[in-house]
Every structure is written in C-alpha cells, then in structure tokens.
From Swiss-Prot:
Keywords: Ribonucleoprotein, Ribosomal protein. GO terms for biological process: translation. It comes from Oceanobacillus iheyensis (strain DSM 14371 / CIP 107618 / JCM 11309 / KCTC 3954 / HTE831). It holds the Pfam family Ribosomal_S2. This is Small ribosomal subunit protein uS2. One of its GO terms (cellular component) is cytosolic small ribosomal subunit. GO terms for molecular function: structural constituent of ribosome. InterPro entries: Ribosomal_uS2, Ribosomal_uS2_bac/mit/plastid, Ribosomal_uS2_CS, Ribosomal_uS2_flav_dom_sf. Belongs to the universal ribosomal protein uS2 family. The gene is rpsB. The lineage of its organism: Bacteria, Bacillati, Bacillota, Bacilli, Bacillales. Disulfide bonds: none annotated. NCBIfam families: rpsB_bact.
Length: 254
C-alpha cells in the first residue's frame, strides 16, 4: 500500500506549483499541466516519490541513523519542529547558521555554551550572580535556543537531511553535498531537482502541503521505532514463557 493517497495530496493542495514564468525546466517531467498561469504537479509521480522517500527514511531509521529536518521559511517552521520532535529527530527551523554541518565542531562549542548556561540556571548559580549578568546570560540563552535548540542533542553529523524548499535552503544543501550527506526534499516547480537525492515534487508554500509531507517522513521513522519496541516486548514475553516452562520442568523432575 502507498504511504500516501492521491486524495490526501489533493486535499492539502500539494499539486499547485509556481507561476509558469517562475519555473525550472528540469522539473518538466514532474508537471502534469498548466492552469491559469500556474503549473499543476503530476500527483501520480508525487505518490511514487513519497513512497521512495518513505522507504529510504525507514531504512535509515532501521540502521539507527538520524535525520535533520530543515525548513526555515514561515510555512515550514512549525511542521519541521513538531514532526522532528514527534519522531525523535533533529531540526533547524530558524536561520541556517553557515557551517552547521561543515564546521560542526565549532557549532558544538556553541551548543556546549548553551548547555552550560542551562546548567547555571538549574543549579542555582544565577541566584548568586549580579542581576545584569543574569539578564545578559538569559538573552544569550534565548538566542542560542532559537538557532541551535533543535540540534542540541545531535552529537554527530546526520545520516540524511529532509529539506523543504531547496532554493531557500541552498546553504544547507551545499554543505550536505560537500560531506556526501543524502538529501530528501520537497521540490516545487521553481527548484532544481538535480540537487536532491530523493525528490518529492510538491507545493512547498502551502502550510497543509508541507505539514502532510513532513508528517509522512516522521511516520516512517516512528513505524520503525514502534516495530522495534514491539519486538523487544515480544522477546521479553517469550523469555518469560521459556523461564516458566523451564521452572515447571524442574519442579516436575523433582
């Protein structure tokens, strides 16, 4: 069964592309038709591409890998944060800081600074510091949380990026390319699909469309995680049954 239905895509407005004058000819193969000066995306191809991306995300999750969700445009910020948190992954939904991937060790230093301020706040250090210093530290913390909060626990480079709007996130994409990190992306009719390893041709401007597709990637991760949890429970149950049977056998022999 497909990971997503044509009905879901239509209801979310995934098929609406950009104006015909703002297009990338490389997206031609994903365009169904043109209507009132707007390109209509071929949703049959979107269904197929969502399936490919879904299976790839499941593969990463099965191997214990991590995915960094990236979407800094207004329409994507909430979905990127919510779905990354729901699936236990990482996210960047404010400005992409140059070097987030290519200069990861420096970024880690900023994250350690954030953790250090949070520790000071928790262990009572703030209570003995001058009020002005505390105010400055809280401002610094707020700024660090805004830009780095979503990757605070990311201790190594991600195994893949999930990106909304490659044009908007071109710095993130360039960094991923440099490090050979695969990219899954929601790609509208004005983008270059060649930059993306797993293209999802779709409207990247409608909040509902972005939410639907982002939630599907999170679902793929959770499908794997919940499957693993079920396996652990079954293993524990089987072990308990085996122990009971062994105990019964011993008591029978006695």
């Amino acid at each position: 069964m497909a990971a997503i239905s044509m009905k879901q895509l239509l209801e979310a407005g995934v098929h609406f592309g950009h104006q015909t004058r703002r297009w990338n000819p490389k997206m031609k193969k994903y365009i169904f038709t043109e209507r009132n000066g707007i390109y209509i995306i071929d949703l049959q191809k979107t269904v197929k591409k969502v399936d490919e991306a879904y299976n790839y995300v499941k593969e990463i999750a099965s191997n214990g890998g991590t995915i960094l969700f990236v979407g800094t445009k207004k329409q994507a910020q909430d979905s990127v944060r919510d779905e990354a948190i729901r699936s236990g992954m990482y996210f960047v939904n404010q400005r992409w800081l140059g070097g987030t991937l290519t200069n990861f060790q420096t970024i880690r230093k900023r994250i350690n600074r954030l953790k250090s301020i949070e520790k000071m706040e928790e262990d009572g250090t703030f209570e003995v510091l001058p009020k002005k210093e505390v105010v400055n530290l809280l401002k610094e913390k707020e700024r660090l949380v805004k830009f780095l909060g979503g990757i605070k626990e990311m201790n190594k480079l991600p195994d893949a990026l999930f990106v909304i709007d490659p044009r908007k996130e071109r710095i993130a994409i360039a960094e991923a390319h440099k490090l050979n990190i695969p990219i899954i992306g929601i790609v509208d009719t004005n983008c270059d699909p060649d930059e993306i390893d797993y293209v999802i041709p779709a409207n990247d401007d409608a909040i509902r469309a972005v939410k639907l597709l982002t939630s599907k990637m999170a679902d793929a991760i959770l499908e794997v995680k919940q499957g693993e949890e079920t396996e652990v429970v079954e293993e524990e149950a089987n072990e308990a049954v085996a122990e009971e049977e062994a105990a019964e056998e011993v008591s029978t022999q006695e």
